Every structure is written in C-alpha cells, then in structure tokens.
C-alpha cells in the first residue's frame, strides 16, 4: 500500500547516499516509523524488489547525544539481525549502508504488510489461523531465547506477512542480548504489551529486574487479541490499564469467547501469568495441546484401490456436509427478540453492520473497547513510571498513585 508523501519524506540526495543509489532504485513509500521511512526499492542489477528503511541521523533534527543513541541502537539491531539470519520466521537483513546523515537497512519485501492491518480487516481470526500464526511466532521467539536474545517489543505491528501468509518477526530496535541469570531494568516497549514485572521494576528500585519471560507475556496478549479482536488489558485511563496489567485482570467475557475452545483459553492463562516464574517458556508453549493439530501425522500406507475408495468416500462426505451446512435451523421471532446476540449468525450480522458503520470504534463492553487496538498515538520517550506517578502531573492524582501501588 502506497502512502502519501510529505516534505519530510523526500529522498536523500545522491551525495548523501551514493553507495545505496548505485545498487538500489528507491520507489514508493510503504510505511513510516517514528524517525524513519520505509520504501519499496528495486535492485538495479537483478530487478528484485526489497524494502528499505531510511533513517535520517543529521544534526539538524537530533542533538549529538540523540544521534549517538540512534546510531548505537541501529548498529545493535543490525548485529542481532545478522546473528539470527536464516530463520524462516524472522525478517532477513539483506544490506545496510551508513553515511554522515542517513542510515539504510534493506530487508525482504513483505507484500501482505503487518499482521495488525490484516487483523483490522478481519476483526478477529479463527482458531485454525491463529494456531498457525502463533506457532510460527513462538518458534521465532524460542530461537531468539536459545541465542540469549530478548525482543521486548512483540506486537501485531511488528509481525509481517509474506505472499503465502507466513509471518516474519521484525523491528528489533529494543532487542538486546541477555545472558542466563542476567536481568534488565530499562522500561521500553508498547504499554498494552508490557509485562507486569517491567512495570513493577520501574516503580520499585528494589525489584530484581526482568528477563526473557516478558516476550511470552506479549505472546499471550497477541494470542488473546487475535481471537477476540480486542486486547485483554484496556481502560480509557492508562493508569488503570497499567494496574490491570500488574494484577493480571482480564476476562473471557465478550461474545467471541463463546465459540473458542477451553484449550486455547488455557494456553492464554498460562502465558498471562503475573509471576514470570510460573509463565510458560516458548518451548513449553509449543508443546501445549493447542498446537497438537499442527503436527503432521504419518501418511497411510494404502494400495491404489484403497486410496480410490478413500477419495470417493471423502468426496461424498464433503458433499453431505456442504449440503447440511446450508440447511439453517428455523429462527423464531421469540428467540430473536429474547436474546439476538446469543445467535451466532445474527451476532455476526450485527457486528458486521456496526463495524461498517463505525469503523474501528466498536464498543465491546464496559471494560473492553476495540478502539484500544486501533489507536495510533505518537510514541513518547518512556520516563520512569514512578517519577510520572509521584510528580505533579495534572493528569494523575495522588489517589490514583495510591490505587496503582495498593
């Protein structure tokens, strides 16, 4: 999808990016970040298409301290991407270039875009589709953890889809190496996907810190969001949302969960454990019964005659199932008036109509609002939450500080 071009999206001049221009021909804009633009580009020699992330690191926009910070973070991201290169579910760094004013990172072109956009279009995914996506994501996370890398910013926006709807994990800007037994204290990530221990660590100087378990919490939030179409933790006041996260307060109360299996609810519950020591690891999550259906079974050793008979019976059974699925049970007026939302076809009709009328702003209950999933606010630097809470901010009262800490 091509995006509108603004003055800040102008291409670097030839002198500032000579090496990049000699090899690639930049095309239309396909995405934007906080301090970067992503363009489709074409390899001049082969004609192959890629995506290039262009970051301006000039003194005109950033202070010297910020410049060094951005360059160091980008180099760290490049180092990690090269270390994990070759995994089928992690984005591949093809090329990189650096000049005095710009940095260029060339990646595989993921034509289907972000999982977030796909979810926006579909509203909620089936268990079958979710199973495939989450299995691939957990395999990527397990690979990172085996290599002592923690991602720290897992969310649908950082999961890309290729032409075959296979996922690739991207955006390793917050990733870092973490040796066994080592702990982190830095507050980073996206609020709705932050693990409780990250928040507690920022509010309590005596907290021991957090580890790789934060990635599994984020996987639990993503799994819940894919199936429900809305996040597990949301409140219009962010301070209360953070308390919900720290206490692990979420519910399977929206109508979507009526059609979900207890198996997937069990997996979500084991990923969204407030105690990181009780939370599943990526390897353990992949062994959960929810993923049993993904495992390939041994092929039957059948004769040609037996294969033909199986094919005939399969076709006949499929025809009978298709025929019976079109025979809807009669809907009485009393049933429709009594509880229309309890009837799955009617519920889907209501949801589709509401979604077409109001877009993403569809209320899902007193404590759930689909708006939380689709809000786009400019990211701000993360201060220490304790400082925010104990300051004189007019947006947060002393009562709310007590509420969060109680």
UniProtKB/Swiss-Prot annotation:
Keywords: ATP-binding, Calmodulin-binding, Carbohydrate metabolism, Glycogen metabolism, Kinase, Nucleotide-binding, Serine/threonine-protein kinase, Transferase. ATP binds at residues 30-38, 53. Pfam families: Pkinase (PF00069). Its EC number is 2.7.11.19. PANTHER family: SERINE/THREONINE-PROTEIN KINASE. It catalyses: 2 ATP + phosphorylase b = 2 ADP + phosphorylase a. Residues 306-330 are annotated as: Calmodulin-binding (domain-N). Residues 24-291 form the Protein kinase domain. Residues 346-370 are annotated as: Calmodulin-binding (domain-C). This is Phosphorylase b kinase gamma catalytic chain, liver/testis isoform. Hexadecamer of 4 heterotetramers, each composed of alpha, beta, gamma, and delta subunits. Alpha (PHKA1 or PHKA2) and beta (PHKB) are regulatory subunits, gamma (PHKG1 or PHKG2) is the catalytic subunit, and delta is calmodulin. One of its GO terms (molecular function) is enzyme binding. It is an enzyme of class 2 (transferase). Catalytic subunit of the phosphorylase b kinase (PHK), which mediates the neural and hormonal regulation of glycogen breakdown (glycogenolysis) by phosphorylating and thereby activating glycogen phosphorylase. May regulate glycogeneolysis in the testis. In vitro, phosphorylates PYGM. Gene3D superfamilies: Phosphorylase Kinase, domain 1 (3.30.200.20), Transferase(Phosphotransferase) domain 1 (1.10.510.10). The gene is Phkg2. GO terms for biological process: glycogen catabolic process; glycogen metabolic process; positive regulation of glycogen catabolic process; signal transduction. InterPro entries: Kinase-like_dom_sf, Phosph_kin_gamma, Prot_kinase_dom, Protein_kinase_ATP_BS, Ser/Thr_kinase_AS. GO terms for cellular component: cytoplasm; cytosol; phosphorylase kinase complex. Belongs to the protein kinase superfamily. CAMK Ser/Thr protein kinase family. The active site is at residue 153. Transmembrane segments: none annotated.
